[in-house]
Amino acid sequence: MARALEQADGRWAWVVLLSSLVTQALTLGFPTCIGVFFTDLQRDFQASNSETSWFPSILGAMVHGGGPLCSILVKHFGCRVTMMLGGVLASLGMVVSTFSGSLTHLFLTAGVITGLGMCFSFQSSITVVGLYFVRRRPLANALASMGLSMGVTLWPLLARYLLETLGWRGAFLIFGGILLHCCVCGALLRPVATNEVPEPKEDPLLPPKIPTRSCLATCVSTIRYHLAFDILRHNMGFCIYVTGVTWMNLGFALPHIFLVPYAMHHGVDDYWAAMLMSIVGFCNIFLRPMAGLLLAGRKSLAAYRKYLFAVAILINGLTNLICTVSADFRVLLGYCLVYSLSMCGVGILVFQVLMDIVPMDRFPSALGLFTILCGVTSLISPPLAGLLLDKTNNFSYVFYMSSGFLVSGSLILGVGFYAAEKKKLKQDGQAKMENATSEMTPMHDLTSEDKDSAKKQPYPESIYMTNV
């Protein structure tokens, strides 16, 4: 995989950006429409809330949890092949899911296969933007994240229309054809010229001086490299980021799954209930470019991006409490408008902060470890919320749960980044003091002969104070 571009921010980079935007609209935006099918799937398979919730949880877990495998494919085959492979898998899973006779079959096809394909396409689209853009990277990430907003806007409306005309099986068949367009987006990622000498064919994990190595040791080294455990162990910022965002992810996806059923449960028309998520996406289409221009145009904000990210998560968590006040459509509409603002901040900063923390040559591996942890939380959170809903029959507790995870996750990030920055400043200050002390040799440690020789040296050569 190329790491240093010959023409960063070039003309073809904008074509790649468009490809990334469309790919994120197709992949990340799709899970937000699952709530439209929630009631029909529950009725057709005669399942409870917790059982039906396993479908979006498995889909979300695979979208995130396939990260390590995706990073291996990106390293060995590049983003182009990986994205096109993801498009084929995502389409195949949705088409085969139309023949599902039970929830188990649906979990395997539309959940596992489609989710893994979406993971390959979505993560490749993020990685390739970081490689094609350097100077305008914050703006590029913000524009690419518009894909999620467009997906959130269009997928629920399309899902509602197809559900009413073709049923959920026909809708899933159409979705399979739509997801195949990820292959077209991948074809646009043509190879990039670099200034770097091609890497040797030997595996860097197997030094040429070592003739033999056990299979187990090789597997362990490969896993450690592609899961970025070395970064997690030595990079405090990455450790804080992974901990906070993984914890936050336990509550972040819940409104996307349960908002539409919540509105329908309280008498809101099916069409207008599906429109709520589309309103969130529509607002983000305009908010994200403006936020991206703000971040890209002011370099002074670069040092505070991680704190802005924590604040956005905090606001997002507090916003979910609005749903507990009332289920009236006007209240939910206001909730969606406020939620859009905080979701915009989270969306444009989540990967930009990660790019600020880790070097780009290790970004695919760091993204793989981060996403597999988020995949675990995505697998746990919706069924847990569904079980809570079955026990209480009250949607308010689901939004309380979401708010609690988001607020606590923002505190982990904000306090953690602040403490790590203070610790680093303290260590840097101590290191400078030690260097200055070691460069100045005290006169009382010199012999009389050394003192005489020191006095005979020219004045300019007797001073070695430096900041380097």
UniProtKB/Swiss-Prot annotation:
Q: Which gene encodes it?
A: Slc16a5
Q: What spans does the record annotate as topological domain Cytoplasmic, numbered to this chain?
A: 1-13, 75-80, 123-138, 193-239, 296-306, 352-368, 418-468
**Disulfide linkage:** none
Q: Which family does it belong to?
A: Belongs to the major facilitator superfamily. Monocarboxylate porter (TC 2.A.1.13) family.
PANTHER family, A to Z: MONOCARBOXYLATE TRANSPORTER, MONOCARBOXYLATE TRANSPORTER 6
Q: Which residues lie on this side of the membrane: Extracellular?
A: 35-53, 102, 160-171, 261-274, 328-330, 390-396
Task: State where the protein is found.
Answer: Cell membrane
Q: How does it sit in the membrane?
A: Multi-pass membrane protein
What does this protein's UniProt record list under function?
A: Proton-linked monocarboxylate transporter. Catalyzes the rapid transport across the plasma membrane of many monocarboxylates such as lactate, pyruvate, branched-chain oxo acids derived from leucine, valine and isoleucine, and the ketone bodies acetoacetate, beta-hydroxybutyrate and acetate.
Quick one: a GO cellular component term? Answer: plasma membrane
InterPro entries hit by this protein: MFS (IPR011701), MFS_dom (IPR020846), MFS_trans_sf (IPR036259), Proton-linked_MCT (IPR050327)
Protein name as annotated: Monocarboxylate transporter 6
Region listing for Disordered, in residue ranges:
429-468
Keywords per UniProt: Cell membrane, Membrane, Symport, Transmembrane, Transmembrane helix, Transport
Q: Where are the transmembrane segments?
A: 14-34, 54-74, 81-101, 103-122, 139-159, 172-192, 240-260, 275-295, 307-327, 331-351, 369-389, 397-417
For bias kind Basic and acidic residues, which ranges apply?
446-455
Give the Pfam families listed for this entry: MFS_1
Q: What is its main location?
A: membrane
Please indicate if the UniProt record lists Iron as a keyword: no
**SUPFAM superfamilies from the entry?**
MFS general substrate transporter
Q: Name one GO molecular function term.
A: symporter activity
